[in-house]
UniProtKB/Swiss-Prot annotation:
The active site is at residues 13, 41. It is an enzyme of class 6 (ligase). This is Adenylosuccinate synthetase. The lineage of its organism: Bacteria, Pseudomonadati, Thermodesulfobacteriota, Desulfobulbia, Desulfobulbales. Substrate binds at residues 301-307. GO terms for biological process: 'de novo' AMP biosynthetic process; IMP metabolic process. SMART domains: Adenylsucc_synt. Gene3D superfamilies: Adenylosuccinate Synthetase, subunit A, domain 1, Adenylosuccinate Synthetase, subunit A, domain 2, Adenylosuccinate Synthetase, subunit A, domain 3. Homodimer.
Length: 437
C-alpha cells in the first residue's frame, strides 16, 4: 500500500490533471482535498479533451473510487452539471464511484454574489483576480463557523435555520454595502432541497473510508488544486487562493493521518506561468513570453484568461520542495521549449542589491524582485513525439538534470505533450520513495 500526494509547485496550471490521470492507473482511491470549482484540470485521453473542476479525474477509470474531502468547498449545481456532462459522454457517475464528505462546506448563491461585488468594488491595483465563484466568501463562513456543510442538507430543519440566518446577514451586506440585489430565501431553499435529493446518496465519511482502504492495503492518490505559491499561508499573499494548497493539507482536507503519506510529487512546468495579479519575478514581456504563451496554449481551463509566461524559477521550485517535502518532480511541457537556442532559469533573486534564495513574505519586496539567471543551451528538434527518455536531445536531458541538481529532487515523470501517451515515467512514486534534500 502506498499513499501519494500530487501538488502544483508554481502558481497553478502546471498540468496536474494529466499527471493525476497517469498515476490513477496505479491507484485504488483518488481524493480531492482542497479548493473548489475555481480550479480546472484538463487532460486529453485518446484524442478526447476532458476538463474537470470538482470531480477527480480518476472518474474516467471504471474500477477506481473517487472522493471529495472535507477540505473541498462544493458548489452542488456545478457538480451536478459536471456529472451531467460526463453522462452525455457515456460515463454515469454513481454513488459507488464517488463519495462526498458530509463535512465539506457548500458554496451558496450569496457567496458568488459577494465575491463578485467585492472584487468590483476594489481599485484596479488592488484586484486579486478572483474567479468570482464564491470561493473566498465560502471559506470565510467556514472559518467564521457559520458555514453550511453538505451533511446539513440531510436535516431539513437544521438547513432551513442555518440558511435563514445566513441570508439575513448576507442580504444586509449585499444591499447596504454594495448596493447589490438581495438573495431570495425561498428560491435558494427549494434549489438546495432539490440538490439534497440528488446528491445525498453520495454523502459519506471520507476519513473513515480512507482509513479502511489504507488498512486493506489500497493505493491512495491525493489530488491537489492550484499551486504552492497560491497557498493562503505560504503564497504571495494577498494574491493567493483561500485554502492551503501545500501537501500538508492533503491530510487535514481528507481526515488522513500524516504518517501514512509515502511520497509527494510536485508538478512543475519547464517554464513558469501565472494567471491574474501578483508578483511574478521571471515574467517575460517580450516576444519570447508571447511565444511561450502561444506554443503552450496558455489559457485558463476555468476562466479562459490568458496566462502570464516566464522562464523557469528555481527559487519558486525550491520553495515548493521545502514547503511540501517533495520526493519527486513531474516536469510538464518540456516540448514547449523546443526551438529555443538558449533557456534561462532563475537561480536567485536580487532585491536592491541583496541576494535572496526564497520568495520574501513582504508583498512589496516580492514585487520588486529581479531574477538572477543562469543560462543553458536549448535544443532545435521537436520532442512531442518522443516516448523514450533516452531519445530526448542531450540538451533537453541536461536541462532536466539541471533542475534535479538545483532542487535536490529527482524527476519521476517528464511530459512532452497534452496526451496521456506523451508522458515518460522515469520512476513510479507508488514504488520508489526518495527523500528530498
Amino acid at each position: 500500500m502506498s499513499s501519494v500526494v500530487v501538488v502544483g509547485a508554481q502558481w497553478g496550471d502546471e498540468g496536474k490533471g494529466k499527471i493525476v490521470d497517469l498515476l490513477t492507473k496505479y491507484s485504488d482511491y483518488i481524493v480531492r482535498f482542497q479548493g473548489g470549482n475555481n480550479a480546472g484540470h484538463t487532460l486529453v485521453v485518446d484524442g478526447k479533451k476532458f476538463v474537470f473542476h470538482i470531480i477527480p479525474s480518476g472518474i474516467l477509470y471504471e474500477e477506481k473510487t473517487c472522493m471529495i474531502g472535507n477540505g473541498v468547498i462544493l458548489d452542488p449545481g456545478v457538480l451536478l452539471e459536471e456529472m451531467a456532462s460526463l453522462k452525455e459522454r457515456g460515463l454515469e457517475v454513481k454513488p459507488n464511484r464517488l463519495m462526498i464528505s458530509d463535512n465539506a462546506h457548500l458554496i451558496m448563491p450569496y457567496h458568488s454574489q459577494l465575491d463578485q461585488a467585492k472584487e468590483s468594488a476594489l481599485s484596479a491595483s488592488n484586484k486579486i483576480g478572483t474567479t468570482g465563484r464564491g470561493i473566498g466568501p465560502c471559506y470565510m463562513d467556514k472559518v467564521g463557523r457559520v458555514g453550511i456543510k453538505a451533511g446539513d442538507l440531510l436535516d431539513e430543519d437544521l438547513f432551513r435555520e442555518k440558511l435563514r440566518c445566513a441570508i439575513e446577514e448576507k442580504n444586509f451586506i449585499l444591499t447596504k454595502k454594495f448596493g447589490a440585489p438581495a438573495v431570495d430565501f425561498d428560491s435558494v431553499y427549494r434549489q438546495f432541497m432539490d440538490f439534497a435529493e440528488q446528491l445525498s446518496p453520495y454523502f459519506g465519511n471520507v476519513s473513515v473510508t480512507l482509513d479502511e482502504a489504507r488498512r486493506a492495503d489500497k493505493n491512495i492518490l491525493f489530488e491537489g488544486a492550484q499551486g504552492t505559491q497560491l497557498d493562503i499561508d505560504h503564497g504571495t499573499y494577498p494574491f493567493v487562493t483561500s485554502s492551503n494548497t501545500v501537501a500538508g493539507n492533503a491530510c487535514a482536507g481528507s481526515g488522513f493521518g500524516p504518517s501514512h503519506i509515502d511520497a509527494v510529487v510536485g508538478i512543475v512546468k519547464a517554464y513558469t506561468t501565472r494567471v491574474g495579479s501578483g508578483p511574478f519575478p521571471t515574467e517575460l514581456f517580450d516576444e519570447k513570453g508571447e511565444e511561450l504563451q502561444n506554443k503552450g496554449s496558455e489559457f485558463g481551463a476555468t476562466t479562459g484568461r490568458r496566462r502570464r509566461c516566464g522562464w523557469f524559477d528555481g527559487v519558486v521550485a525550491n520553495d515548493a520542495v521545502r514547503l511540501n517535502g517533495l520526493t519527486g518532480w513531474a516536469l510538464t511541457k518540456l516540448d514547449v521549449l523546443s526551438g529555443q537556442k538558449s533557456i534561462k532559469m532563475a537561480s536567485s533573486y536580487d532585491l536592491n542589491g541583496k541576494k535572496l534564495h526564497a520568495m520574501p513574505n513582504n508583498i512589496k519586496d516580492a514585487e520588486a524582485l529581479k531574477p538572477v539567471y543562469e543560462e543553458v543551451p536549448g535544443w532545435a528538434d521537436e520532442v512531442d513525439g518522443i516516448c523514450n527518455y533516452d531519445d530526448l536531445p542531450t540538451e533537453a536531458k541536461d536541462y532536466v538534470r539541471r533542475i534535479e541538481d538545483f532542487t535536490g529532487v529527482p524527476a519521476n515523470i517528464v511530459s512532452v505533450g497534452p496526451d496521456r501517451a506523451q508522458t515518460m515515467m522515469l520512476s513510479n512514486p507508488f514504488e520508489t520513495k526518495k527523500c528530498c534534500k
